Regions:
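Glycine- and acidic-residue-biased ligand/ion/polar-headgroup-sensing regions
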Residues: 145-148, 170-171, 175-197, 385-420, ...
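Transition-metal
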Residues: 26-192, 252-305, 379, 475-488, ...
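Histidine-centered metal-binding segments
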Residues: 306-363
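Loop-centered beta-sheet repeat module
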Residues: 201-250
Length: 513
């Protein structure tokens, strides 16, 4: 049994050998812990953590109303001044060194990793837990980029696992605000060679070959692993990514050549991680401010990240052995054996390949817009104009909501022991994030402002289990002689088989941006 959570740690006094008293206390403690564990989880808000960066600004505190604290030299908590350059607000993180702390409710003061250790699949869902183990799979931040973000790149899952024993870092940027002249550098404006890129990093001429985007509020950009990227000039961004901080700094706009501003660089280490082709515009989704140029399709994830084995021709199909390519209004979505046509298992339910795979949003009047569907996460933009009733069982995973505009409330139906029914209310303001655990049955999203926009992020359940963490994996190797060793191995039906100890390891901390 895992250790009790912070708020349930009693202090046992020495009882002078009184065994009866000790027994009574232990029995009471057992009953308390059993009742504690049976309490149902609720929506979690976490205390945001500031990350100071030379390219940061003041908007996280001034525009989003963030209040950050840090420890001084004596270990005392002090408020971070609004004049400090803060580049990131870590909203939800299970990263070892950075471990989000629950802000409210009866689990306040406990960390996300402690929740994962204690409640396991009740937090993330059974399929997600079976694959990721006790590692929470996503990292969520708000970014304030006013200076120049370094030119950088992130690895994919395969390389990250092989070299760093970590998850890779796919991410999506949602532009909450963009000042005139703000830029995002994303990929290259033409195909380049590794040698040319290397030389330009040393000569300070990298900008000439970078693809430049002038983003507007409401735009979304999928930052695929291997994509060289940077930004500058006044951007407020909501970022959803894999639970990894593997960042390789390639060029730092000349700061690396000044001893006063130099930071660690990783050009040689990352030279073979980079996609040197021309930037795929399908990774950039223009928002409503572009008018007729606005994108109707989600960001196109590179084909190399698909694991489609059913033969679907649709470019957005992300089905593995089971098709999960966008069934709406319930029903099991799968592929025909003949022709590989995607359809819903229940009659009368419309199936949209590549659409939002969760609940009853109305696509006709653009209440929801799919921003990206990838093996690592799906992100949907919700223009919340009317209350929505959400059934979490249709997701089979946790749900994260980031409020990027306006204000909403998450209302959870409750019932007291005497049968009295009520509603528990959780307010979500612009710049706030909330985690809906998989254990919750249903809830309502209710707008508190006419212009309320939410980002909804889920991790797509994975059917297979990483053999690295699967305790049920066969211990034998082909063509090996195990005579005499069989008795020391567990049978398949042995009740003492250990539970998973954790999946992809805790996020590896890179050098940051």
């Amino acid at each position: 049994m895992t250790a009790p959570l912070q708020n349930s740690k009693p202090t046992l006094q020495r009882l002078g050998g009184n065994r009866a008293a000790v027994f009574i206390i232990l029995l009471t403690l057992h009953d308390f812990l059993m009742e504690f564990m049976e309490k149902k989880l609720y929506p979690f808000k976490f205390i945001p953590v500031a990350s100071k960066r030379p390219w940061g600004g003041h908007d996280l505190m001034k525009k989003l109303g963030k209040e950050f604290v840090e420890c001084d030299e004596e270990g005392n908590e002090v408020a971070i001044s609004a004049d400090e350059l803060v580049g990131e607000s870590w909203e939800i993180a299970d990263m070892g060194v950075e471990d989000s702390v629950v802000k409210e409710g009866w689990l306040a003061g406990n960390t996300l990793s402690e929740l994962m250790e204690t409640y396991l699949e009740k937090v993330v869902g059974e399929d997600v837990y079976n694959y990721y183990g006790r590692q929470f799979p996503l990292l969520v931040k708000f970014l304030d980029i006013h200076g120049k973000l370094s030119v950088q790149v992130h690895p994919d899952d395969e390389i990250a696992a092989e070299r760093y024993d970590s998850l890779g870092k796919a991410e999506i940027w949602y532009i909450m605000d963009a000042e005139p002249g703000a830029k995002v550098y994303m990929g290259f404006n033409r195909e380049v060679s590794a040698q040319e890129f290397y030389d330009r990093c040393h000569k300070g001429t990298v900008e000439e070959i970078l693809n430049v985007i002038y983003p507007k509020k409401g735009d979304a950009i999928y930052v695929a692993p291997g994509t060289v990227h940077a930004a500058e000039g006044g951007l407020l961004i909501a970022e959803i990514q894999e639970s990894s901080d593997l960042t390789f700094r390639l060029y730092d706009w000349g700061r690396e050549f000044d001893p006063a501003t130099a930071r660690q660089m990783h050009l040689e280490e990352a030279i073979d991680l980079i996609n040197y082709g021309r930037f795929d515009e399908g990774l950039y989704r223009k928002g409503p401010l572009w008018g007729d140029e606005a994108s109707d399709e989600p960001c196109k994830v590179p084909e190399s990240f698909y694991s489609c084995s059913c033969g679907c021709d649709d470019e957005h199909c992300t089905c593995g052995d089971d098709c999960t390519c966008g069934c709406h209004e319930g029903g099991e979505c799968h592929c025909h054996e003949e022709g590989h046509e995607c359809h819903c298992g229940e009659e009368g339910h419309e199936c949209h390949s590549g659409g939002h795979t969760g609940h009853h949003h109305h696509h006709g009047d653009r209440i929801t817009e799919t921003l990206v569907e990838s093996p690592q996460f799906n992100v949907t933009k919700i223009n919340l104009t009317d209350p929505l009733h959400i059934y979490t069982e249709q997701f089979a995973t946790f749900i994260i909501y980031m409020c990027v505009e306006g204000e909403a409330s998450i209302q959870v139906p409750t019932e007291s022991p005497d049968g009295h029914k009520g509603m528990e209310n959780h307010v979500l303001k612009a710049g706030e994030t909330i985690l809906i655990p998989a254990q919750m049955d249903d809830f309502y999203l209710v707008p508190r402002d006419r212009q309320t926009v939410l980002l909804e992020a889920v991790t797509r359940p994975v059917d297979d289990v990483d053999a690295y963490i699967d305790p049920m994996t066969e211990a034998y190797l082909d063509d090996e002689d195990y005579e005499g060793l069989e008795d020391g191995l567990l049978d398949d039906d042995d009740e003492d088989v250990a539970e998973p100890s954790g999946a992809s390891p805790l996020g590896f901390f890179g050098a940051g941006r």
